[in-house]
């Protein structure tokens, strides 16, 4: 289990929030009000203590084995929570709420996981209630908010990341899957039941595949492997021979920086359908900014530039120029930060309404 990362000294001056909202989550004098944000993915589990301005004060991270199922993940999570709560107490941080960003569809109102596409045993599990029970002895009855991880990431990037200051923010993350979310005036858009903004499941053409088939990380990995096999003397093949891991999209940044044409073709082939899907979002919503995150976005400016350039070509003339396309800025912290801010926001609103 990873130890705490204390970062900069914690002071109240780091919390830039309207006074009435700060009062709604404030505790004993001298304690800094914070939330725990949790990310539960297929292989990664991380928790962070987050201030109301999105500043990460403490973090812990563990790898989990999907073969262990949901029960195995919960065993690791219980230990991780105990550790980070202890870290927070030692740094005079008052935990006021907990937010969870879960990698799959959830029923937010009930705090229940609908299902997981990567780890068995999560279907219909009351995760929010389970977490509340795990921390009750150490924290008392703190509110626990459950979000889909894409929604949590969207809120984080909209409030304190690449979309900060914009009124309408669309965020999309491309990794093992493709998710997205929408924030309007600082509030997540929520559709019916347990899902909305499922960009990765758009069918670009009737009877065709979904966007993830073309633009998810695994689809790009497959194209890289094909290129390595087809061009044994090419730059990607040379990079693959020098690498310890199997060929994947991780080979692209160096090849792109060197001007390799094959790498650019692979990138454009993934960015094109992605831009096409985003053009539908722009035609429907015309947001102020589009923020790109996820593992694929770590390719950086070449990915952002290809998506932005191709997006422009898909838009009707009155909607050009397209909304700015930005890279996400919160990195690995995006889901915990967004989940924590969602939890703090819920608690402050409840306090102003006089709810417990």
Regions found by a protein language model. Give the residues of each.
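ATP-binding/phosphotransfer module of carbohydrate and carboxylate kinases, centering on a glycine-rich
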Residues: 2-97, 107-112, 131-142, 156-166, ...
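Glycine-rich oxoanion-binding loops at beta->alpha junctions
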Residues: 146-153
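Short hydrophobic alpha-helix segments
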Residues: 60-62, 117, 192
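A structural motif shared across PLP-dependent enzymes of the aminotransferase-like
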Residues: 104, 122-128
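Short beta-strand segments
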Residues: 39, 99-103, 147, 171-177, ...
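Short, glycine/acidic-enriched loop or turn micro-motifs at the edges of active sites
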Residues: 42, 152, 176
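Glycine-rich phosphate-binding loop of actin/hexokinase-like ATP-binding domains
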Residues: 164-218
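A charged helix-plus-loop insertion that forms the helical arch/lid used to bind
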Residues: 112-123
């Amino acid at each position: 289990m990873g130890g705490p990362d204390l970062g900069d000294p914690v002071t109240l001056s780091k919390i830039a929030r309207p006074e009435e909202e700060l009062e709604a989550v404030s505790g004993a004098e001298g304690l800094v009000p914070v939330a725990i944000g949790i990310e539960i993915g297929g292989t990664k589990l991380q928790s962070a203590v987050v201030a109301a301005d999105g500043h990460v004060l403490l973090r812990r991270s563990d790898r989990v084995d999907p073969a262990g199922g949901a029960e195995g993940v919960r065993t690791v999570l219980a230990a991780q929570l105990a550790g980070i709560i202890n870290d927070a107490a030692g740094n005079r941080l008052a935990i006021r709420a907990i937010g969870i960003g879960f990698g799959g569809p959830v029923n937010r109102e009930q705090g229940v996981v609908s299902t997981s596409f990567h780890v068995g045993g999560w279907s219909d599990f009351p995760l929010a209630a389970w977490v509340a029970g795990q921390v009750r002895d150490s924290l008392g009855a703190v509110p626990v908010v459950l979000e889909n991880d894409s929604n949590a990431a969207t809120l984080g990037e909209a409030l304190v990341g690449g979309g900060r200051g914009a009124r309408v923010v669309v965020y999309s993350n491309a990794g093992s899957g493709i998710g997205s979310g929408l924030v309007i005036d600082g509030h997540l858009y929520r559709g019916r039941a347990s899902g909305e903004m499922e960009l990765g499941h758009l069918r670009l053409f009737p009877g065709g595949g979904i966007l993830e088939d073309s633009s998810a990380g695994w689809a790009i990995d497959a194209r890289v492997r094909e290129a390595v096999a087809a061009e044994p003397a090419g730059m990607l093949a040379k990079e693959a021979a020098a690498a310890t891991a199997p060929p994947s999209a991780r080979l692209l940044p160096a090849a792109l920086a060197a001007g390799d044409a094959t790498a650019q073709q692979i990138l454009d082939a993934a960015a094109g359908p992605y831009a096409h899907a985003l053009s539908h979002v722009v035609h429907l919503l015309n947001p102020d900014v589009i923020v790109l995150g996820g593992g694929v976005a770590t390719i950086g400016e070449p990915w952002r530039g290809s998506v932005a350039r191709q997006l422009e070509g898909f838009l009707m003339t009155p909607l050009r120029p397209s909304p700015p396309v930005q890279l996400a800025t919160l990195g690995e912290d995006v889901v915990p930060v967004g989940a924590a801010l969602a939890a703090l926001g819920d608690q402050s609103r409840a306090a102003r309404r006089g709810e417990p």
